[in-house]
Structure formats: structure tokens, C-alpha cells
């Protein structure tokens, strides 16, 4: 009697016998697949972030936004609408100053600082937000709540793969819930306490300059090179990197909150030549497709939920 031949199939790394083949084919059948229970998906529970609302109400943040050509992105516009609603609900005082048609960004930032310092003495913080940054109300709330001199959020450069606009520091100070000391942070989303500028006046690189842009004379005494380009260690530094370097020269520290992940709007040239690559990497997209945010629930000091929309 002839022996029964064993059905086999060679694969790249092993040999599959008939018994294994039958098991694989059975498990792959539509009937078996239909009766399989789908694994339970974990609920997308919101991450909880707690802030001290009483403390926030004692602050007055002045938001400064350079808007070259008087333009801002849709992401930035909708962010401000949500922030205005949240600040009103919580009773947080804030003001806004924009800068249009200033092609020299360093001078534009210095002008915004002068207006911040000269407009009102009761403003406690200057918050730089660029016109191409998308953010959520809780992002600004948690930065204020940190109560440190200089702190920013993380936003990517306008390129792929993602690289953050920040420079780390070896053995930098770390705090709870994502607080991280860095050497430099971008001014696209940067919060600065008022007294920082008073202390920077002691730095030799910070110099007064003539008001030749038609600014109100009451701001003349505040026009100084807080933001300027510089060459250090054979590297050309942008105005925000120079600001950070000068502050650290005086013993100051700079932090980022790793929870504050922002959106950085840019332009992209679409063509048939890169269509296949885009579809593989990011899928079908529309120019203004809404970015899905991780759910975050903001709590006050008593543990009550704070509306942020």
C-alpha cells in the first residue's frame, strides 16, 4: 500500500505541513472570520490637566502677534475665537496687539515688546503667538499656570519628518507633567514674564535704538534690541535664539511644556509627480482638513471641569 504523501509548501523561512495548512485555511475562511469577536477598543478617555483658576485670574497676559501683510491662517483665527470664549468664561484678563507690514521680524518683535512695556504696567506676561500657529485654549492656560519666567510649546518646522523648533540641553532641569528645561525655544508660541525684560536691560547686547518707524514717542524708552540676530560660536542665530542665549547668559532658564503640541501651518506645492507618494504617506487630504486633537479635559483646583471651546 502506497504511503500517503504529505502536502507541504515551502515558505521563505520554514516548511508548512498539511495539518498546518488546513488550520491556516480554516481560520482564514469567511465563516470563521465572521464569528470571531472583535477585540474591544480602549475608550479614548480625555487626558486630564489641572490648573489653578484663582491664580490665572491674577494674571494679565498681553498677546503679541506679528502679522506680515495683515494676514493670519485659519488655524490661528479659530484658535483665538476659542481662546476668547474660554478666557471670558474663566474671568481671565488679556489684551492683543498685532504688527502688520513689518518685514524685519526682529524689529517687529522689539516694537511689540515696547508696546507691551509702555501700554500698561499691570500686564504680567507677554505671549508671542505667530500668525501661522494653531493652538488650543488649554495650551495657554497650562503655560501661565507653570509660573516660570520663560516657557513655550512645541511646534514643528515646516518640513517632514517632524523636527521641533527647540534646542534641548544636556542634564536640563525636569519638572512634573512634561516640564523640560531647554537652551532655546521658538517665539512662535512663547510666554515671557514682564520682569524678564527688566533684567535683560543688564545684558551688553541689549541696546536702545532710535524710533524711526513712526511709533508713538511714549514708547521710545522701551525700544531696545531684546530680539536681534547674532553670531555665536561661528553660528548665525535668529532673533528668538539670540533672545534665549542672552537670557541664559544672565542665569535665566527656559522651559517647554511637552504636553503643548501645536500646529504650524505652511504651504505645499501639489503636483501629479508627488501624488503617489503623498497618497501612500498621508492619505487623501483636503487643504483645510481639520486636525484631530487628543482629547484633553481641563480641571480647576477643585477638580471641576473647565469648558474650553
Task: Label each residue range with its predicted role.
Residues 105-109, 240:
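Conserved donor sugar-nucleotide recognition element shared by glycan-biosynthetic enzymes
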Residues 122-134:
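Short beta-strand-to-loop acidic/aromatic patch adjacent to the donor-nucleotide binding site
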Residues 2-13, 37:
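Arg/Lys-rich low-complexity patches in intrinsically disordered regions that function as generic
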Residues 56-58, 206-309:
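C-terminal catalytic/acceptor-binding lobe
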Residues 136-228:
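Conserved catalytic core of nucleotide-sugar-dependent glycosyltransferases
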Residues 111-125:
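Active-site nucleotide-sugar/metal-binding loop of Leloir-type enzymes
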Residues 125, 149-150, 254:
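Short, Asp-centered acidic motifs that coordinate Mg2+ and/or phosphate
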Residues 36-103:
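N-proximal low-complexity "stem/linker" segments adjacent to membrane-targeting elements
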